[in-house]
């Protein structure tokens, strides 16, 4: 009976969240065709699936959700359940289906994430949120993608013919969940690195995507969660990024839980790790992304 309890708790939470938010639209990032696409199958076409707050619950912020999966898949429990939780708190959530290895390599993934931020910004009026309150959350390899979006962005391309490309790709905040960060260190995740960069990537490319080396004073603030028991993506990834944020003077909040395996998602059934969503909500209020 005992092993059923976490599953039951997750089911009950999912029912509650679903009553407060529903999936609505699927947005193709490049309606005219994805640059660099190898075909027209679903895996070749990055999209955003929209989860809106219930009527009267919109708090005027948005978040892009990047599931993990080692850059070779997209974990279901880091997908819809995450978006529904954020929507239940008043954020408009957009789940990013980004391109994956080994069919695709860098920069396809960050191109998708940057385009996602721009696209969400272009939808601010339609969905009723502030274009300066757009965050990104990523889990594991999705955390690497989110941290890449937060350190490899641009202000927009003024001469672009596509109006979306004229918008900034900088997220206003990051939520990094047991993230892959330090590609150029012994703490990196070899599977994510291989799917992202191939077997023998140039050293300079690896270093440029070891995102603790890319933090500046202009990097957006971050909320970071990891566990000391994570043997898949070592906690040093979160520690190195937090140290870089501190050195750059960028607001950052780290929650390092003693217990917990890799890939817990919302953490339903884990009495400690399951506290992170509430802590994140408090942080979003303190940072002014949600009303207090």
Named regions from a protein language model:
Residues 46, 160-164, 199-214, 219-220:
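Active-site nucleophile elbow and catalytic-triad environment of alpha/beta-hydrolase enzymes
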Residues 67-72, 228:
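Active-site glycine-rich loops that stabilize anionic/oxyanionic intermediates
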Residues 115-188, 206-207, 211:
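Primarily recognizes the serine-hydrolase "nucleophile elbow" in alpha/beta-hydrolase
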Residues 224-226, 230:
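Short beta-strand/loop motif that positions the catalytic acidic residue
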